[in-house]
């Protein structure tokens, strides 16, 4: 073998090894994006995502904007794409605002999924969904109904914003259920805290002051629910039923003091974990279809459902929804079993 031929073979070997290393690295890099950082709900989801990364041997990066904005999420998405990440999983602040950036990412071969809050279905492959709008909207009304024991009542809705996808879907279903099953309930106001703890507390206090005879506040938002509970304590209002969605660690003191009798959520740590497992399966298998099942360590089996379970008309190959196995009602009896 000539020296020239030896050098050529050696160079090709080095380039081949480098290419393999780059492909392995790219396939192992998954970005997990919340609406914003610094909120316990999203931190818990990120913890689940990173736990899954360790189990699967993939590199999961958790990062989000400091405020819930389309521009902040788009900047992160573009950065992750430019850095060569192979999959992006995002809790969208807007159903359509992220679509141009996500479609560009998909055109470059990046796997795009959503969790917690969806985009339009054509802007992602799979949505890791905590529950259908009917399930979660119904859950909100049922929690309120267990405490509002009268035919005529005044109810307020209070959550993050008028544009966030999932909460508006839940509230739409909840209002429809109220109209059908509790026609004597009057929805006196719908207000927003915009994912800001201070503004949420001010808004909640404003609701309770403006409607002194309010029977229930329905707050399906991780900031709005504790704000409503704190507002009731600040104003010494022990007559209003406060229900909604938040994490057990945040709500524990309000439940223990009796300010909140029960509230709901799902295991957001599991949601983060499932999201990464689905992304990893896509990277390894190439695609999944409706009816496909996936076994997840410590969770069990999940299944790909059509977009129609979320009320969407859009269906396509390699596109669908993965529902969490269950949702949870927290109360004084069981809240001690949970830590997230």
UniProtKB/Swiss-Prot annotation:
Reported function: Part of the ABC transporter complex LsrABCD involved in autoinducer 2 (AI-2) import. Binds AI-2 and delivers it to the LsrC and LsrD permeases.
A cellular component annotation (GO) from this entry? ATP-binding cassette (ABC) transporter complex
Q: By its UniProt entry, which InterPro entries does this protein fall under?
A: Bact_Solute-Bind_Prot2 (IPR050555), LsrB (IPR030159), Peripla_BP_I (IPR028082), SBP_2_dom (IPR025997)
User: What Pfam family does this protein match (any one)?
Assistant: Peripla_BP_4
Q: Which residues belong to the signal peptide in this entry?
A: 1-26
State the family it belongs to: Belongs to the bacterial solute-binding protein 2 family.
Q: Is Signal among this UniProt entry's keywords?
A: yes
The encoding gene is lsrB
Gene Ontology BP, a term = transmembrane transport
A GO molecular-function annotation: carbohydrate binding
Q: What is this protein called?
A: Autoinducer 2-binding protein LsrB
Keyword GTP-binding carried by entry = no
User: What does the annotation say about its assembly with partners?
Assistant: The complex is composed of two ATP-binding proteins (LsrA), two transmembrane proteins (LsrC and LsrD) and a solute-binding protein (LsrB).
Chief location category = periplasm
Alphabetized UniProt keyword annotations: Periplasm, Signal
Origin, by domain of life? Bacteria
Query: Where found in the cell?
Result: Periplasm
